[in-house]
A protein has these predicted regions:
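Charged DNA-binding/catalytic regions of mobile-element recombinases
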Residues: 1-177
Length: 177
């Protein structure tokens, strides 16, 4: 789990919080706020982990928002917090990679107008990330295990399906009559 900041068109800073499962690179929870606090983080963790699941560890940095209250909540839910070293983002490389991909693939192209707009952009990007974006570490699969559809016939043509407002595309087959 981690935070990253996003400036709006009015230069207001918004904070995006996310929890990522390392195995399939799946975003378990994501939300946006203007003023992150430890109480807000605990609420987000309640939403990310509503019940005991297959997860054992949570990797987090030394951000002041991940204080005693957050650590206590994690331990109470059966999750073991693992803090990274000071100024060592490579120790949470999967989360940092997701932040970089999110910035390169959507946030560097679209300026968020406000908190609701950023929340929608992030929600749409997470959907794209789970269903369409392939990952080398997953052997060119998606976190949701995308089905590969073979060409149905020799007359089928490739069609482009825009994603994220046309910034990215997914391709499929269409039968020609």
């Amino acid at each position: 789990m981690d935070f990253f900041t996003v400036p709006t068109v009015t230069f207001q800073l918004l904070y995006c919080f996310f929890v990522i499962a390392h195995g399939r690179r799946k975003i378990l929870h994501c939300n946006v706020t203007r003023h992150p606090t430890a109480e807000w983080v605990v609420q987000q963790l309640r939403e990310a982990f509503p019940e005991a699941g297959p997860y054992r560890y949570v990797i987090l940095d030394r951000d002041s928002k991940f204080d005693h209250e957050v650590i206590t909540f994690l331990k109470a839910t059966g999750l073991q917090p693992k803090r990274t070293s000071v100024r060592a983002p490579w120790q949470n490389g999967i989360a940092e990679r997701w932040v970089g991909s999110c910035r390169r693939e959507i946030l560097n192209h679209v300026i968020a107008l406000n908190e609701q707009h950023l929340r929608r952009l992030i929600r749409d990007y997470v959907k794209y990330h789970h269903e369409d974006r392939t990952h080398d570490s997953l052997k060119k699969d998606t976190p949701n295990k995308r089905a590969v559809v073979p060409r149905p016939s020799a007359s089928a043509t490739v069609i482009s399906m825009p994603r994220l407002g046309g910034l990215h595309h997914r391709y499929g087959w269409r039968e020609v009559a």
